[in-house]
Amino acid sequence: MAFFGEEAEQNVKKAIELKYSLIPYIYTYAREAHDAGLPIMRPMFLEYPYDVETFDTDAQFMFGKELLIAPVVKKNAKTKNLYLPEGNWLNYNDKRTLYSGEQWLTVDAPLSCIPMFVKQGSIIPTMPVMNYIGEHPEYPVIFEVFPAVEGQSASFLLYEDEGTDLGYLKDEFLKTPINVKTTLKGLKLLFPHVRVVTISYHLSGI
């Protein structure tokens, strides 16, 4: 990678670390793909079939239900024109900047940053970055919570199995629900105490 220079090396490293941190999210949707045939990478109109604007979004996609990815596909481009469907969306890279949905917008897109957005009212399971999968078998799951507006809930059903054998074919797996409801008094967490986890709240927009 040094052949391409230090900047390219750092950008690739950052992208790989992002992938590793999202493994619990990716693995959950990989199981859904196995069970239901739904792809992890989804055209926008698959999640938003009644929004005609999504029919023209051929350079962005949903990654599961919660994340919207808009990769730069034009040489030397420094910005990205993209469409956000209904709802509110946070810039997943800074976890702070909030955008209203049902609009086209242009965002900065340096080589070091893939434009990514998470829908308000989502929960993203993540894990610490490792050198390889299985380096730390007893890793903590970190739930990133992007709370819904008052009166609504954010939820996720995390899927886990050993990942090293076919035990899942014999129902040797765990599905763990997490729900965070936004109330007038604050956030109410519903989570079964089946393992130690970390909850990280991102409160922009509520």
Where are the predicted features?
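Catalytic core of carbohydrate-active enzymes
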Residues: 1-198, 202-203
